[in-house]
Design a protein with these regions (language model features):
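Membrane-interfacial catalytic/cofactor-binding modules of polytopic membrane enzymes
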Residues: 1-74, 120-142
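Active-site His/Glu-centered metal-binding helix of metallohydrolases
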Residues: 76, 80-81
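Extended hydrophobic/aromatic segments used for targeting, binding, or gating
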Residues: 82-118
Length: 142
């Protein structure tokens, strides 16, 4: 699947469509599982992470470990940009993304599904998970 097809599948609209950001926000925040949130969030970034990080890792490692490494890599790339701009070493987003990766794995393992709730409740649950992971990451930032 190429990038354009991937984005159309995730957002329901073609790459560059005027309502793609809106669709991404509605679909990701309204996801009934935290793992589904990540299926819709930032499809361009997730396409390349999946193709060049997750899938190659999954060949040699268990899927859960591959997912955690992919989340940590994504967080580290975000941290790296901040470190270059600030010219100072700090890791906040790496542990944040790693914690969110753990939430994806735990949620899928425990079969946590809140898709029967209304969109505002689903969005609140997803925002709560993301915010909770960020608060914990602030406590352990390096």
């Amino acid at each position: 699947m190429n990038l354009s097809d991937y984005i159309r599948k995730r957002n329901g609209v073609p790459l560059g469509a005027s309502n793609s950001l809106r669709n991404m926000m509605i679909r990701s925040l309204g996801a009934g599982k935290f793992s589904k949130f990540w299926k819709y969030w930032n499809p361009i970034w997730s396409y390349y992470l999946g193709k060049y990080i997750f899938k190659p890792l999954k060949i040699i490692l268990p899927p859960a470990l591959s997912l955690l490494i992919t989340f940590a890599f994504c967080g580290f790339i975000h941290d790296l940009v901040i470190m270059i701009i600030r010219w100072d070493f700090a890791l906040l987003l790496t542990p944040w993304f790693l914690l969110m990766g753990f939430c994806v794995i735990i949620g899928d393992y425990a079969k946590i599904d809140y898709s029967k709730f209304t969109w505002p409740i689903r969005a609140s649950i997803n925002i709560l998970i993301i915010s909770g992971c960020l608060l914990i990451a602030y406590q352990i930032q390096i």
